[in-house]
A protein has these predicted regions:
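Catalytic core segments in nucleotide and nucleic-acid processing enzymes
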Residues: 1-162
Length: 162
């Protein structure tokens, strides 16, 4: 067959803020509007995000405690059924902000996952995104970073059932 060149790993967006690196996958995952689990990022998406983190840690020397992963999903802040998740993994309050953390995706093949191996699910209000398309002010970068860093307060990932 014809020769094909392999494309290198290229994450959607990398945000560097306060000395930390955030690998962001921002596609139109419909979960932010539908709430349907079938509209969440799937296994290959999760694997790819974890691979990006491994690559950055290994080749760029970024310490794992300063490296995070997140799926960014659009949602409607004014009309949503999402709840912020507490450190124990239980819902605590409805998301009323422009940015919220709705959970995480992990690979069950990773015992004791590093922060970047626990891919955070972040919703961002679509109207807010449109108004901040050109550049995100530091206040919003801080808000996004804080939402992603909630991984540090979550309980350990339970072992997979066998």
């Amino acid at each position: 067959g014809p020769n094909r060149s392999k494309t290198p790993l290229q994450p959607d967006t990398i945000m560097i803020y306060n000395g930390k690196v955030y690998v962001l996958d921002a596609k139109l995952y419909r979960y932010g509007y539908s709430g349907n689990p079938n509209h969440l990022p799937n296994g290959p998406d999760i694997n790819k995000q974890i691979t990006y983190g491994e690559y950055i840690e290994r080749t760029k020397g970024v310490p794992s405690e300063n490296l995070y992963n997140a799926f960014i999903m659009p949602f409607n802040r004014e009309d949503n059924t999402f709840f912020e998740m507490g450190a124990d993994g239980n819902p605590i309050s409805r998301i009323t902000d422009n940015i919220g953390n709705i959970g995480e995706a992990v690979g069950d093949w990773k015992p004791n996952p590093k922060n970047y191996e626990r891919v955070q699910g972040i919703v961002i209000d679509t109207r807010f995104l449109m108004y901040n398309y050109i550049g995100m002010p530091d206040q919003q970068k801080r808000q996004l970073a804080e939402a992603i860093e909630k991984v540090e307060t979550r309980a350990p990932v339970p072992r997979p059932a066998t």
